[in-house]
């Protein structure tokens, strides 16, 4: 009887190891599917974009069976915490605030932000540097923010909700602007084109992609933004306790960087090399 019981326990242990290994080789990745060209859907509803293709290559490098699932942006981090998926690849910038809740892999791409207006706007021709990094500070940054504060006074600026762009506008760095939030970037773009907002703030490539596909006269104005509230590049979001998965993603990202895959995909989807 004891031998039978030992055999039973051994079988249970073997099954536990088997299922643990199977789960370790299976990864579910959450993305929004509504932030082109980072992630989007084609006419058939298939997920496409820079991060969708990159995720597939990272999974090959990790020898993992991956599934990419959709999640609304404002529920992205809660969904990860609730274990609806194991990782986030959704144009999510690495910020100190987010790292209080989740971990991030090393960055795989830069995401510079920009203000956008419709052609003919009074905001065209803002006299600012081409780019500012809020982490470095200095007179150029201070002067640029001062110029923006004066120019944006009384203006309504559209942003996607729960983003670094909303956080920046509400930080007071550019005065007390009127911020209008939207569930998706597509809604921001549509209201900008319709003249229901004066300007919008998002990743520069989100506007250039929209302009190219819609034919609308969207114009980028002012400086591009990085650092500070805008974070330190885009990375894979992972739960705090998934330390091995974090190591696996970092190793795969290193491989993709060294063999040029990130650069290749960035040029394909963004039109320039945004790899980090």
Model regions: which residues?
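Extracytoplasmic small-molecule ligand-binding "clamshell" domains
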Residues: 24-94, 100, 259
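Bacterial N-terminal signal peptides
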Residues: 9-18
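Periplasmic-binding protein-like
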Residues: 33, 110-114, 208, 212-251, 253-269, ...
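A local structural motif
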Residues: 59-70, 151-156, 171-184, 196
């Amino acid at each position: 009887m004891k031998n039978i019981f030992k055999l039973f326990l051994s079988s249970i242990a073997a099954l536990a190891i088997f299922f643990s290994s199977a789960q370790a080789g299976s990864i579910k990745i959450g993305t929004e599917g509504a932030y082109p060209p980072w992630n989007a859907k084609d006419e058939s509803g298939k997920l496409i974009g820079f991060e969708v293709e990159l995720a597939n290559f990272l999974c090959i490098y990790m020898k993992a069976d991956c599934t990419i699932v959709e999640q609304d942006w404002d529920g992205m981090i809660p969904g990860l915490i609730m274990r609806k998926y194991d990782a986030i690849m959704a144009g999510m910038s690495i910020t100190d605030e987010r790292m209080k809740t989740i971990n991030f892999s090393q960055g795989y791409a830069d995401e510079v932000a920009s203000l956008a207006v419709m052609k003919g706007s009074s905001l065209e021709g803002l006299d600012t540097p081409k780019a500012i990094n809020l982490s470095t500070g200095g007179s150029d940054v201070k002067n640029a923010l001062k110029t923006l504060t004066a120019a944006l006074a009384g203006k309504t600026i559209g942003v996607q909700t729960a983003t670094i762009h909303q956080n920046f506008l509400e930080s007071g760095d550019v005065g007390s602007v009127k911020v209008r939030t939207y569930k998706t970037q597509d809604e921001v773009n549509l209201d900008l084109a319709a003249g229901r907002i004066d300007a919008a703030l998002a990743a520069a490539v989100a506007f250039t992609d929209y302009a190219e596909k819609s034919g609308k006269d969207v114009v980028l104005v002012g400086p591009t933004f990085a650092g500070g509230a805008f974070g330190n590049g885009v990375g894979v979001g992972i739960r705090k306790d998934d330390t091995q998965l974090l190591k696996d993603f970092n190793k795969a990202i290193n491989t993709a960087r060294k063999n040029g895959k990130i650069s290749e995909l960035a040029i394909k989807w963004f039109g320039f090399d945004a790899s980090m």
